[in-house]
Amino acid sequence: NLSTDLWSTMGEQRQTNYALRAPDKATFVELVTEGQPPAPGYFVYNAILNRQDRDLLDETEMPPAMTYGEVRQVVDSGAILVDGRSPEEFALGHLRGAINIGLEGRYAEFAGSVVMPDVDIVLVTEPGLELEGKNRLARIGFDRVVGYLSEPYQVMFSHRDDVRIASRLT
């Protein structure tokens, strides 16, 4: 139960906050975590990063645009291809090996659950959403976006042998 107050004092919180009346740390933790979903998979990694001195995220810095050949080279070397387009667009056609994590949903949380944090990432997005994809991943500590596929629809049209189609069940 979160208060709408913009500020408070420790004295007031000790009187009114149920969790601060817990007799010990274990009871406090139990009270404040009751009914909460489990922490996302990336949470421990992110907590460790939060304790380190790190450069500030430049939210205006675009990831590098990459050609199809450059993308294939880094993916073949172990990078993950994260396709942030809608599930419908992904199903109609995506590059071999791509993982669909749509930007319109819980993008960072889902990516943090399926992508390892120590792996390079290449993005495929709708044109103009590359920076959003990079920034949302960086906010959970996944700052190894090495670039994005430039002109994804033209690339898929030109390299049909590397395009896969997926069925969607509803």
Labelled PLM ranges:
Residues S150-E151:
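Amphipathic alpha-helical protein-interaction segments
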